[in-house]
Swiss-Prot record:
Keywords: Disulfide bond, Secreted, Signal, Toxin. Belongs to the three-finger toxin family. Short-chain subfamily. Aminergic toxin sub-subfamily. Pfam families: Toxin_cobra-type. Disulfide bonds join 24-45, 38-63, 67-78, 79-84. InterPro entries: Snake_3FTx, Snake_toxin-like_sf, Snake_toxin_con_site, Toxin_cobra-type. SUPFAM superfamilies: Snake toxin-like. This is Synergistic-like venom protein. Expressed by the venom gland. GO terms for molecular function: toxin activity. Residues 1-21 form the signal peptide. It is found in: Secreted.
């Protein structure tokens, strides 16, 4: 009986998401990039390109709760795995 109870506890711990925190690449293309753990409720990484001129884009990355909209002359990539927005 104790073995069954212990097995159930172990299976429960393995199957539950106990405080998993998403890690995203953050920063701008000009200021350098790093990684950070996202705050509670932020379960999406994003990478946003904004066209600044011919062949010139400003790129920003980070964590978000909802995928941001692309600007008229840009695009956005959203994803949900660690460092998927490189």
């Amino acid at each position: 009986m104790k073995t069954l109870l212990l097995t159930l506890v172990v299976v429960t711990i393995v199957c539950l998401d106990l405080g998993y925190t998403l890690t995203c690449v953050t920063g701008k293309s000009i200021g350098g990039i790093s990684t950070e753990e996202c705050a509670a409720g932020q379960k999406i990484c994003f990478k946003k390109w904004t066209k600044m001129g011919p062949k010139l884009y400003d790129v920003s990355r980070g964590c978000t709760a909802t995928c941001p909209k692309a600007d008229e002359y840009g695009c956005v990539k959203c994803c949900k795995t660690d460092r998927c927005n490189k």
